[in-house]
Design a protein with these regions (language model features):
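Terminal alpha-helical segments
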Residues: 1-237
Length: 237
């Protein structure tokens, strides 16, 4: 199987990859359901999580078609996104979250905990290990319980259904140059800007002038001030 880095940076290639991922997700959901029916709950849980990951990968690849694929930094970040289990899981929930924003507001903490549980439960559902608290060996069948496995299989099926609807009815978002730059920006650099009070003074002035695009504000601030060692407040005071 080709490694992700060997994918051609073209919309056609990413479209084909997205279609393959969603088909594989459907197969994984079917297989997870069969395992649950035969009470192989640990393996059912593992395959259900894998199905959610593949669903998320399909969505990442779909949205990637609207980015500047000729930019090496953007494409490198895309490879990182569809190769990361956590990002895949988060992306798998995006269609359902987008259609029920009120539920997101009410259940934000529960949703965050659910995504974390899926990320953390993946490996214990497949591999034996030594518990860190008492140094005892544990089997996946001892860790994953029936309710958790069946719930995870249903969740995988729901994510798949929502993703199929999204992929059928939408076109890839067309991202601006600033949005692509923000997407490719290292997380440490982004968080440094977000934690800089001077940026927020800049952002408030931009918003008051009717320029409320977050990506454009971040990139503009970094180019005009942060990267050249200047302060917005000092320059405008």
């Amino acid at each position: 199987m080709d490694q992700p880095t060997r994918v051609t940076p073209s919309a056609a290639a990413l479209s084909a990859y997205s279609e393959a991922a969603i088909k594989n997700a459907a197969e994984l959901v079917d297989e997870a359901s069969l395992l649950a029916e035969h009470r192989h709950f640990a393996r059912a849980y593992f395959l259900a999580v894998a199905a959610i990951e593949e669903t998320g990968k399909a969505l990442i690849l779909f949205e990637a078609q609207g980015r500047n694929l000729k930019d090496p930094a953007v494409f490198s970040r895309l490879i990182q996104a569809w190769s990361d289990h956590g990002e895949e899981i988060t992306s798998a929930f995006m269609p359902s979250l987008a259609t029920d924003r009120e539920a997101v507001r009410k259940n934000a903490v529960a949703l965050a905990n659910l995504m974390a549980a899926l990320r953390n439960g993946r490996e214990p559902a497949m591999y034996s290990d030594i518990r860190s608290d008492n140094q005892k060996a544990q089997l996946p069948s001892e860790v994953v319980h029936e309710v958790a496995a069946r719930d995870c299989v249903r969740l995988a099926a729901d994510c798949l259904t929502d993703a199929r609807t999204y992929l059928k009815n939408r076109t890839p978002t067309q991202y601006t140059m600033e949005q692509d730059k923000l997407f490719a920006l290292k997380r440490t650099h982004y968080h440094r800007t977000m934690n800089n009070p001077d940026f927020w003074w800049f952002f408030v002035e931009e918003a008051e002038a009717g320029r409320i695009d977050h990506a454009a504000a971040v990139i503009s601030y970094r180019d005009k001030f942060e990267l050249v060692g200047k302060s917005f407040r000092k320059e405008t005071s």
